[in-house]
Design a protein with these regions (language model features):
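C-terminal alpha-helical cap of glycosyltransferases
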Residues: 286-299
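Short, aromatic/basic amphipathic alpha-helical patches
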Residues: 60-62, 88, 163-172, 239-241
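Active-site and donor-binding regions of nucleotide-sugar-utilizing enzymes
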Residues: 1-111, 128, 132-136, 143, ...
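Conserved sugar-transfer catalytic core signal across GT-A, GT-B, and GT-C glycosyltransferases
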Residues: 31, 136, 193, 213-217, ...
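Structural alpha-helical scaffold elements that stabilize or flank donor/cofactor-binding regions
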Residues: 9-13, 68, 120, 197, ...
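Conserved catalytic-core segment of nucleotide-activated headgroup transferases in glycan assembly
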Residues: 105-177
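Catalytic binding pocket for nucleotide-activated donors in carbohydrate/polymer assembly enzymes
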Residues: 72, 88, 199-267, 273-274, ...
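Acidic donor-binding loop of glycosyltransferase active sites
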Residues: 15-19, 183-212
Length: 299
């Protein structure tokens, strides 16, 4: 985001660029400055602000970032509270919701899980660890997995060292690439499958909640899958709302996650799981329409 690089980029594309669009927090001050000077319309969508958001802080870095945000022709927020906070700083915005809801619902309707994994699951209850890290995997290693209760792990990192580490936690597990299905635990060691795998899951353990923050919870929600995560969800509006709707459960520690998962898998909790899954899907469905609203403002 330097003056020379931004200038070179715009000079190479200026005749073709009709507008610039960014998502959530992707804002580059120098780029915004030169877009404004070049009269190229700019938009940012799916933004979410809290009083602690960096551009809203009364500090030198905060004022610098706020200046960059002020150069957008239109800011689309996810909710009223974000727009209210921006208004206090003199910035106008439009509440448009989160266009990711449209995308994940479309994915849920068109994606298909591999047939061999569907056959492997059969009628068992399947727990899918999506974008997992070592904390979630350690918690899952304390659960007994059987023919009727199976585990699929799709780790955030799939390099060979990490896959080997996971296999050492679950000696009975096999890699998906081995095509060996005589096991109750499969570790996904290829990319691009996670979205479709949620169609098989009865419960999703979404990773990241014990680190910098959880990974995508809208994808499992779009498939009507109840979720368990670590506690770090507050930066993610959709996760907070899913928890309020009882579609997402948090566990303060990996040990608590193990206990929570065992409780949810208990035979007398079938209806609670169904209600959580239904609440997840209803939440995503209620968020749709954002993409159409945003596109109506674009040149």
């Amino acid at each position: 985001d330097t003056p020379r690089r931004v200038r070179a980029f715009l000079n190479s594309t200026a005749r073709e660029v009709k507008f610039f669009a960014s998502c959530k927090y992707e804002v580059w001050p120098e780029l915004m400055k030169q877009l404004s000077e070049s009269k190229i319309p700019s938009f940012v969508f799916a933004t979410h602000f809290t009083p602690k958001s960096s551009p809203l802080k009364n500090s030198l870095p905060g004022r610098f970032l706020l200046r960059a945000w002020s150069r957008f022709d239109m800011i689309f927020t996810q909710d009223e509270s974000s727009s209210s906070l921006l208004k206090l700083k003199g910035l106008n915005s439009v509440v448009a919701g989160d266009p990711r809801a449209d995308r994940v619902l479309s994915i849920s309707k068109h994606s298909r899980a591999p047939e061999d994994l569907k056959a492997w699951k059969g009628d068992a209850n399947l727990v899918l660890a999506g974008s997992s890290w070592f904390q979630e995997e350690g918690a899952l290693a304390s659960v007994v997995w059987t023919e009727n209760r199976k585990l699929m792990i799709a780790p955030h990192e799939i390099h060979s060292e990490n896959i080997d580490r996971i296999l050492s936690l679950f000696p009975q597990a096999t890699r998906y690439s081995s095509k060996s299905f005589e096991t109750n635990i499969i570790v996904i060691d290829s990319i691009g499958l996670l979205s479709s795998l949620y169609s098989l899951a009865d419960i999703a353990v979404v990773g990241g909640g014990y680190g910098k923050g959880i990974h995508n919870v809208l994808e499992p929600a779009a498939f009507g899958v109840p979720m368990i995560t670590g506690p770090k969800i507050n930066r993610f509006r959709e996760a907070v709302l899913l928890k309020q709707h009882s579609a997402l459960h948090t566990a303060a520690t990996p040990l608590a996650l193990t206990k929570k998962l065992k409780a949810l898998l208990a035979p007398d909790n079938t209806q609670q799981l169904k209600r959580s899954g239904d609440a997840a899907l209803s939440f995503v469905t209620d968020q749709t329409g954002s993409a159409e609203k945003i596109s109506s403002y674009l040149p």
